[in-house]
Amino acid sequence: MQRPLIVAASLSAAIVALAASAVAQQGQLQLPGGGLKPPPPPPVRPYQQVAVTPPAPFDDPSFVAFRKQLADVVARKDRAALAKLVVTQNFFWFQDKDLADKRKSGIDNLAKAIDLDAKGGPGWDTLAEFADEPSAAESPQQRGTYCAPADPGIDAKAFVALGQATGTDPADWAYPSKDGIDVRAAAPPNSPAIEKLGSVLFRVLPDSGQQDDPNQPLVLHVATPSGKTGFVDAAAVAPLVADEICYAKDSGGWKIVGYLGGVAQ
């Protein structure tokens, strides 16, 4: 995903470079009749460890208070109150370009970006996760705009080399949100642990998803640097590439000013 306006310098540059490399390496397969299908995922094999430093909390007291206010509004699913926490004009919504409709209000653009108004849609849950996210980082290109979650600390060159060596895309990678998570032999949470992951990148395999029993927690099927495969609790994992929500502070306090990512258009 390109982010023409808001870009976190070194890691985002590495992600763009690796994404371009992955597209060039993988291509697509031609099907009879002229159709295309994605290539098979790269094989699982051991890979070089790349250390990760999780993003630090943005502990500005006024921002912490704003997040609490946002969490309260989201818990009530109060759209009118939410509108007061979003800029009325000049809201931006980037995927490969700015998708915001400048004729509409900020809340209407935010709602479209996260499917807020869809019955049973993910919008309110998405906002709840952002309200709970303590990190945020100022954009080098737009001072005074802070986007969350902030990028983790990673050696950009090592990450590009990792992606090229494994033939993977940036979206295939994640890291533990806390140091030391168990990798289990099977999806059920009582399965034996086969390895413990520290603060390093690990590969998320494409068959990750909800277990057959909806009462069981969401797990991710992963490949560790040692070349083993197993399952980790999705709640203990942060994806390397994810949507971001952006904030800015004016005389009236903090406001939501933009969104990076969102529902496919």
Regions found by a protein language model. Name each.
Residues I194-V237:
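SH3/SH3-like beta-barrel superfamily modules
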Residues L29-D72, K84:
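Short, low-complexity N-terminal intrinsically disordered segments enriched in polar/charged residues
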Residues M1-S10:
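Bacterial N-terminal signal peptides that target proteins for export
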Residues D78-Q89:
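Short, well-ordered alpha-helical segments enriched in acidic and aromatic residues
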Residues A17-S21:
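N-terminal signal peptide c-region/cleavage motif recognized by signal peptidases
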Residues D117-Y175, H221-Q265:
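Boundary regions of SH3-family modules and the immediately adjacent low-complexity/disordered segments
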Residues N90-I107:
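Short, charge-rich amphipathic alpha-helical segments embedded
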